[in-house]
């Protein structure tokens, strides 16, 4: 029985035909979508991951939906297309497909300000503030804001994600919120998956109370610890694929797997790593395929861009994560979304340049099988967990990885954080006139008219407004990490557009807080 492998509750006898079970449809949250060519590109930094819930293990009787809603059927279609993109016409067709606008909802618009208290969850939940005190803000995104909240009866801390009803523009948006809660309820108690404590609704918002994770993000923990080997990477990969296998076996597809959506519960060395943010997740029927383009550019599967995909797309995303864990860089890279998508569709997988010569052949074999462009030939989550490199008794070496991997991981994480910090601080502190002036400053710096400036130029441009940006956030912002190459570039038009969008979100949040304080 040498090749028998057991993981959690399932053994290694998986096939494509019996892997996926359970109900229905689709989840929401204005997924990251590339824009049409005649519109300003939308920056990746404002994806839904900004709404991360820094989510601590706790238990209790969750106050959830009493009855399961029967989700509406999503348009599904023919079997999975396994063809590689090999000609220019096919590639352009796929890119155009990914760049298409989201279809307009064919339903009546709701007057969200007038929604009754039970209109979303369809059950009386009581008011959040009867049971919890709200604390500091943890993060925000297009649909909601996450706060620390403290349970009045126990003093336990949780994370509370509040979704204003005015952002639920139609019946489908309301269904999506119900389904996100239902999916978290469906996964309740599963290891390495964030737990939901309860759901509440008032006349202004829907509130999801979840466990609070204070141990930080996946990449930050790796860099902080300093000691990093293939065996450690294999252990982390096993946790990630264990989450995927658990979700798939319960008929759920995550659809937004990436390092930012995995958080440690606490700072302990053996802290559990948990998957968070199921806002784009969906229930799945056997053989069901989906057509909406969702996810994050570096981690998106080619069949998602082709608008015909199933749970195999989660395996691709997890494969990209393992590639980054072992090399510190993304396998398919570009300076714009379109360049990234081109690489995802037909770029060559690099497993030969540094640091790959020092990585084991077993690890590279697994990555090739997970980043197989034909989803029919791609490994399932169960098969990945049975691969020799990832098993507990497997062959992942315990020798340290090349030091460049850690430095690349640090840069990979720090660059994204720099952009997000700059966006948030600028949007909070600069007037519209100053933001316009900042754009003109970048245009002056950009003598080659490339539309891009280096991080050093970005820093210098921001320093002109230092009188308005005089706080601890800006001090941190101006201390660009040494691991972030100052000659790397950022698209300043994307940067400015993201600032404008973030200002709108912040103004809306202020209005929501005012409205919520006057209503119970």
Swiss-Prot record:
Reactions catalysed according to its record: L-seryl-[protein] + ATP = O-phospho-L-seryl-[protein] + ADP + H(+); L-threonyl-[protein] + ATP = O-phospho-L-threonyl-[protein] + ADP + H(+)
Region (Autoinhibitory domain): 396-426
Regulation: Activated by calcium. Autophosphorylation may play an important role in the regulation of the kinase activity.
EC number(s) per entry: 2.7.11.1
Keyword Transferase: yes
PROSITE patterns membership: EF_HAND_2 (PS50222), PROTEIN_KINASE_ATP (PS00107), PROTEIN_KINASE_DOM (PS50011), PROTEIN_KINASE_ST (PS00108)
Residues of the EF-hand domain: 433-468, 469-505
Residue intervals of the Protein kinase domain: 132-390
Role according to the record: May play a role in signal transduction pathways that involve calcium as a second messenger.
Name this protein carries in UniProt: Calcium-dependent protein kinase 25
Organism: Arabidopsis thaliana (Mouse-ear cress)
């Amino acid at each position: 029985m040498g090749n028998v492998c057991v993981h959690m509750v399932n053994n290694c006898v998986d096939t494509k035909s019996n892997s996926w079970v359970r109900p229905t449809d689709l989840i929401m949250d204005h997924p990251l979508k590339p824009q049409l060519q005649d519109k300003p590109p939308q920056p990746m930094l404002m994806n839904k991951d900004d709404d991360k819930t820094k989510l601590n293990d706790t238990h209790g009787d969750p106050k959830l939906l009493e009855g399961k809603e029967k989700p509406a059927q999503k348009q599904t279609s023919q079997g999975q297309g396994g063809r590689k993109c090999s000609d220019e016409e096919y590639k352009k067709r796929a890119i155009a497909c990914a760049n298409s606008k989201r279809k307009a909802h064919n339903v009546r618009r709701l007057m969200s300000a007038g929604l009754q208290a039970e209109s979303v969850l369809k059950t009386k939940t009581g008011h959040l503030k009867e049971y919890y005190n709200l604390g500091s803000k943890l993060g925000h995104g297009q649909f909601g804001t996450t706060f620390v909240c403290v349970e009045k009866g126990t003093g336990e801390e949780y994370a509370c994600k509040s979704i204003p009803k005015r952002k639920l523009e139609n019946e489908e948006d309301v269904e999506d919120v119900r389904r996100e809660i239902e999916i978290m309820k469906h996964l309740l108690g599963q290891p390495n998956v964030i737990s939901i404590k309860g759901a509440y609704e008032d006349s202004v918002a829907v509130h999801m109370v979840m466990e609070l994770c204070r141990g930080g993000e996946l990449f930050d923990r790796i860099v902080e610890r300093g000691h990093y080997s293939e065996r450690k990477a294999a252990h982390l990969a096993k946790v990630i694929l264990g989450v995927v296998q658990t979700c798939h076996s319960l008929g759920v597809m995550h659809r937004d797997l990436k390092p930012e959506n995995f958080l440690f519960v606490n700072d302990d060395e053996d802290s559990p790593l948990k998957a968070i943010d199921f806002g784009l997740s969906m229930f799945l029927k056997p053989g069901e395929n989906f057509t909406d383009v969702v996810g994050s550019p570096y981690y998106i599967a080619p069949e998602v861009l082709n608008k015909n995909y199933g749970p195999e797309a989660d395996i691709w995303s997890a494969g990209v994560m393992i590639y980054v864990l072992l090399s510190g860089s993304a396998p398919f890279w570009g300076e714009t979304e379109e360049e990234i998508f081109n690489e995802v569709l037909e770029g060559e997988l690099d497993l030969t340049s540094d640091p790959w010569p020092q990585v084991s052949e077993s690890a590279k074999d697994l990555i090739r099988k997970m980043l197989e462009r034909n989803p029919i030939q791609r490994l399932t989550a169960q098969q990945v967990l049975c691969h020799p490199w990832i098993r507990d008794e497997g062959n992942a070496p315990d020798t340290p990885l090349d030091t460049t991997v850690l430095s690349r991981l640090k840069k990979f994480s720090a660059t994204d954080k720099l952009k997000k910090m700059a966006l948030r601080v600028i949007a909070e502190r600069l007037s519209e006139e100053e933001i316009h002036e900042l754009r003109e400053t970048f245009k002056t710096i950009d003598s080659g008219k490339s539309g891009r400036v280096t991080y050093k130029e970005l820093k210098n441009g921001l320093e002109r407004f230092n009188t308005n940006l005089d706080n601890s956030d800006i001090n941190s912002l101006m201390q660009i990490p040494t691991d972030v190459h100052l000659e790397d570039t950022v698209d300043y038009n994307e940067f400015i557009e993201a600032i404008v969008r973030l200002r709108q979100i912040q103004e809306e949040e202020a209005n929501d807080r005012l409205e919520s304080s006057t209503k119970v």
